[in-house]
Amino acid sequence: MNSARPTIVESSTLAEPMNADVDGLLLFDAGCPFCRRSVRWFLARERRDSRVAIVGLETPLGERLGRHFGFDPSDGDSIRYLTAGRCHRDSEALWRLCERLDGSWGALARMQKVPRPLRDGIYRFVGRHRSRLAPSDDARLEGHPRWIDRLTQAHCRHLELPLSLAGEAPV
């Protein structure tokens, strides 16, 4: 049996930098190896017509979005998924992201049929134990082509967010 960790290969379509065609924004705990691995898994299986950008919850942009949507990004207790002017969290964010998966992986979005208290309970259980679910040496994502440090006015228009959230990159 091979003891080497499996490698998640990123699609060559992700090689270009994130442009204004963003149609979703995934905020996650960038310090969590399980979260980083999960984001890589998602991006490797995302449909070609889906353009989700990624950002860490505890970055200046994550904090600004937290203030706007009324959540504390330092909690890091849940992913957030922004699209069409709305902020989704927990299992709702997860099934909405699953709708963007390619091929039969998209069937995971059917989890929305499970009663929300049950699916959120499972989501939170995994979240409490996530530190044991991935090796701590998983590479960071800050340099990934889908990572953004700021929202442009074009991003805000595509995501249906107020233009006031657009701003300069942090110094």
How does the language model describe each region?
Residues 49-63:
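Thiol-based oxidoreductase modules, predominantly thioredoxin-like and allied folds used
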Residues 28, 55, 112:
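Active-site-adjacent beta-strand anchor residues
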Residues 2-12:
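N-terminal leader/targeting and pre-domain segments
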Residues 2, 48, 73:
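Long C-terminal interaction/binding lobes of large macromolecular proteins
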Residues 13-48:
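Local sequence-structure signature of Cys/Sec-based thiol-disulfide redox active-site neighborhoods
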Residues 60-171:
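Thiol/selenol-based redox catalytic cores and closely related redox-interacting motifs
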